[in-house]
């Protein structure tokens, strides 16, 4: 591949992510206001959870929230299956991020939140998913075309990161 092709590929990726952000901007609604209010009113910890790339985005959002004075941390849904659910309490706010909303590792986290009536904000693309249905506040991320082969989350994680920065 010639070097000139690299720039074309980069421009295509950037264009796809710009389109994703435009769709996200148009999608903001009252649920976004409800999510911000829940964060502002939280008198305990804000816990962000995800799997894979969504977990990495959750970690960045948690770090950003902590930087502005909101006690926050991230937890991998994989770790929750091995005893880390004990770090979440009733007064906490739980934000779960998943593109599909049906990732198997999230099921124990979602059930735990519902069982103990922990406020759950779901950041998800699929409205027919377990995460969407179980969330108290639903932030729907528009489904978008991923860059490259379409198997690695690129545009969708760009949307997740942007909504986290907005929160």
Summary of predicted features, one role per range:
Residues 2-44:
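An N-terminal, well-structured beta->alpha segment
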């Amino acid at each position: 591949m010639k070097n000139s092709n690299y720039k074309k590929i980069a421009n295509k990726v950037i264009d796809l992510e710009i389109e994703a952000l435009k769709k996200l901007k148009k999608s903001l609604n009252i649920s976004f206001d409800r999510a911000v209010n829940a964060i502002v009113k939280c008198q305990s910890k804000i816990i962000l959870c995800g799997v894979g790339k969504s977990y990495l985005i959750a970690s960045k959002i948690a770090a950003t929230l902590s930087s502005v004075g909101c006690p926050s941390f991230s937890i991998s849904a994989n770790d929750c299956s091995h005893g880390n659910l004990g770090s979440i309490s009733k007064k906490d706010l739980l934000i779960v991020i998943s593109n599909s909303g049906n990732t198997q590792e999230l099921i124990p986290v979602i059930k735990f939140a519902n069982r103990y009536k922990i406020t759950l904000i779901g950041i998800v693309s699929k409205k027919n998913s377990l995460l969407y249905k179980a969330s108290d506040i639903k932030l729907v991320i528009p489904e978008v075309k991923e860059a490259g082969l379409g198997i690695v989350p690129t545009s969708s994680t760009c949307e997740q990161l942007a909504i986290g920065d907005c929160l």
